[in-house]
């Protein structure tokens, strides 16, 4: 993958959630909500406080989905990143 976000943007790969509940019920893909957390894969030159490899939580309706190397990523404005998971 070769993508460099511009300005105050970050490239995030969503973290896939489990496909079964604690009681063993399988959740079909069309019934799951998209995860609101992911791993930062690249950061723009104006981004502070977030670095590549950080796990972040982001706003539900933020960002733009893009496909790179057969994977789906999210390009987020840094204002849509709510926090870093430590």
UniProtKB/Swiss-Prot annotation:
Transmembrane ranges, per UniProt, are: none
Supply the SUPFAM superfamilies for this chain: GroES-like
UniProt keyword annotations, A-Z: Chaperone, Cytoplasm
Q: How does it assemble?
A: Heptamer of 7 subunits arranged in a ring. Interacts with the chaperonin GroEL.
Any Pfam family the entry gives: Cpn10
Q: What does this protein's UniProt record list under function?
A: Together with the chaperonin GroEL, plays an essential role in assisting protein folding. The GroEL-GroES system forms a nano-cage that allows encapsulation of the non-native substrate proteins and provides a physical environment optimized to promote and accelerate protein folding. GroES binds to the apical surface of the GroEL ring, thereby capping the opening of the GroEL channel.
Q: In the UniProt record, does the keyword Chaperone occur? A: yes
User: Chaperone: present as a keyword of the record?
Assistant: yes
Gene3D superfamilies this protein is in?
GroES chaperonin
Q: Name one GO cellular component term.
A: cytoplasm
Chief localization: cytoplasm
In the record, what terms sit under GO molecular function? ATP binding; metal ion binding; protein folding chaperone; protein-folding chaperone binding; unfolded protein binding
The highest taxon in the source lineage is: Bacteria
Give the family this protein belongs to, as stated in its UniProt record. Answer: Belongs to the GroES chaperonin family.
* Annotated GO biological process: chaperone cofactor-dependent protein refolding
- Compartments, record wording: Cytoplasm
Query: HAMAP family in the record, alphabetically?
Result: CH10
Q: What is this protein called?
A: Co-chaperonin GroES
């Amino acid at each position: 993958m070769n993508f460099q976000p511009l300005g105050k943007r970050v490239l995030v790969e969503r973290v896939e959630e489990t496909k079964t509940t604690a009681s063993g019920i399988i959740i079909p893909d069309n019934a799951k909500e998209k995860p609101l957390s992911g791993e930062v894969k690249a950061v723009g030159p104006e981004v502070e406080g977030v670095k590549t490899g950080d796990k972040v939580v982001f706003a539900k309706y933020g960002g733009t989905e893009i496909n790179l190397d057969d994977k789906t990523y999210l390009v987020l404005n840094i204002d849509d990143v709510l926090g870093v998971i430590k």
